[in-house]
């Protein structure tokens, strides 16, 4: 588990890229990366982050699983749980976030997504 808290001055490139109007930023996040020794327990990556600069702010993050041995019922449960959480906010966001994760975590050299996938989102305010 890693916790990040960062305060800093923005440079011109950052201000232009994200259309920011302040000179300073605040960012914080929590990341969990677990590579268990037991091959029956999947690898998990999870990150949630928050960025703020002046009146501009957003959240980003994601979660995905990479099992060594894929159990279809477990994969289905994982995705159904993510969908249930997303549906509380907007029934369309799970499919958008899942595609975003599939694209973001695509392993071009293997021509496949990482593990059984998950969700990814950024710049949500």
Identify the role of each PLM range.
Residues 1-17:
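Gly/Pro-rich turn-and-neighbor structural signature
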Residues 26-29, 57-66, 111-125:
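Glycine-rich, often proline-containing surface loops adjacent to acidic residues and nearby aromatics
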Residues 36, 52, 67-69, 123-125:
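Beta-strand elements of well-folded, non-transmembrane domains
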Residues 12-19, 23, 27-29, 50-52:
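N-terminal accessory/cap region of cofactor-dependent oxidoreductases and related radical enzymes
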Residues 54-96:
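Compact, glycine/acidic-enriched structural inserts
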Residues 30-43:
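Conserved phosphate/anionic-ligand binding catalytic regions in large, soluble enzymes, centered on
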């Amino acid at each position: 588990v890693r916790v990040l808290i960062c305060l800093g001055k923005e440079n011109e490139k950052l201000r232009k890229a994200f259309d920011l109007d302040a000179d300073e930023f605040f960012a914080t996040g929590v990341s969990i990366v677990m590579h268990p020794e037991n091959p029956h327990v999947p690898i998990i990556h999870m990150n949630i982050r928050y960025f703020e600069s002046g009146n501009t702010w957003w959240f980003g993050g994601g979660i995905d699983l990479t099992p060594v041995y894929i159990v279809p019922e477990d994969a289905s449960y994982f995705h159904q749980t993510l969908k249930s959480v997303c549906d509380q906010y907007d029934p369309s966001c799970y499919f958008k976030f899942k595609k975003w994760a599939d694209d973001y975590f695509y392993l071009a050299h293997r021509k496949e997504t990482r593990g059984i996938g998950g969700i990814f989102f950024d710049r949500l305010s």
